[in-house]
Amino acid sequence: MRPPPALALAGLCLLALPAAAASYFGLTGREVLTPFPGLGTAAAPAQGGAHLKQCDLLKLSRRQKQLCRREPGLAETLRDAAHLGLLECQFQFRHERWNCSLEGRMGLLKRGFKETAFLYAVSSAALTHTLARACSAGRMERCTCDDSPGLESRQAWQWGVCGDNLKYSTKFLSNFLGSKRGNKDLRARADAHNTHVGIKAVKSGLRTTCKCHGVSGSCAVRTCWKQLSPFRETGQVLKLRYDSAVKVSSATNEALGRLELWAPARQGSLTKGLAPRSGDLVYMEDSPSFCRPSKYSPGTAGRVCSREASCSSLCCGRGYDTQSRLVAFSCHCQVQWCCYVECQQCVQEELVYTCKH
């Protein structure tokens, strides 16, 4: 059954980015982490030939590489975004059968699983977050602090701290993130939708922070700035979206003459189906179990688990081995006069549980 045209469009107007935008970068790119020899995360942005060389080292599309070469400081930001997305993905899925292992990632990207949806969302979210922070930190040449507070009673507020520039970040992403496909097939639209979910999750975490100034804390003047929430909070939001992801198919919007995402009604539901909401992660195929090694994951054999919380599910019914090990930790700590804490080293026995093969 075809949905009404207006219904099929619900929730698809997102952040004014192109409908076909998709995150072919980070965990959804050809290569996740490209090391820059001799460059630490706190290094100053490279200039000139060094910047161009760093752009060439990244596995980007031709258009993305051109944008990178025109933006001094962008190469380091892209690298940091890839790291951030990977670390957050692995943290959020550390107790799951699929733990965001790089092994099998390319196989996942060829399918429409829930895990694929999360990779697109966390990659676009990490890039949005990192780019906004890079602007406020002065690491990008073409952008600076957010300078459009949009608050009431501006006369009473003095903007003095450099805010995270989410406006520039989302505008830049509209050019940087592009689809390898057209927007005519279901997979392309699903990738675009999940990319937007990641961007929207970052945007929802933007907060206005103020500090009062004045005699006796009268707050006659306030210094305010816009600040993104920690990326861990964004990761938690996206993990919740993953847990409640919506399976979709396609339907033709007769008014616009194009395919739209469509979530069929669940069995026993009184509704005929709806378009997914703008914050829903969407997928097209049921995921494999991830229990055994496959082209999608290395399986769960040898994974450390919690006997009370995760061994039953993580080990897929194969059981688990128990090993004892000695762990050193600081104990009997005392504050010594003035300036330091003195501790003893203690050792305790710890049981470690690992999934059987």
Curated annotation (Swiss-Prot):
Q: Which residues are noted as glycosylation sites?
A: N99
Give the UniProt subcellular location, in the record's own words. Secreted, Extracellular space, Extracellular matrix; Secreted
Q: Where is the lipid attached (O-palmitoleoyl serine)?
A: S216
A GO MF annotation of the entry reads: cytokine activity
Disulphide bonds in the chain: C89-C100, C135-C143, C145-C162, C210-C224, C212-C219, C291-C316, C305-C311, C315-C355, C331-C346, C333-C343, C338-C339
Leader sequence segment: 1-22
Tissue distribution:
Moderately expressed in fetal kidney and adult kidney. Also found in brain.
Pfam families, alphabetically?
A: wnt (PF00110)
SMART domains (UniProt xref): WNT1
Q: Which GO terms describe its biological process?
A: branching involved in ureteric bud morphogenesis; canonical Wnt signaling pathway; cell fate commitment; cellular response to retinoic acid; cellular response to starvation; collecting duct development; cornea development in camera-type eye; embryonic cranial skeleton morphogenesis
| Entry similarity comment | Belongs to the Wnt family.
PANTHER family, per the entry: PROTEIN WNT-9B, WNT RELATED
In Swiss-Prot or TrEMBL terms, this protein is called Protein Wnt-9b
Please state the gene responsible for encoding this protein.
WNT9B
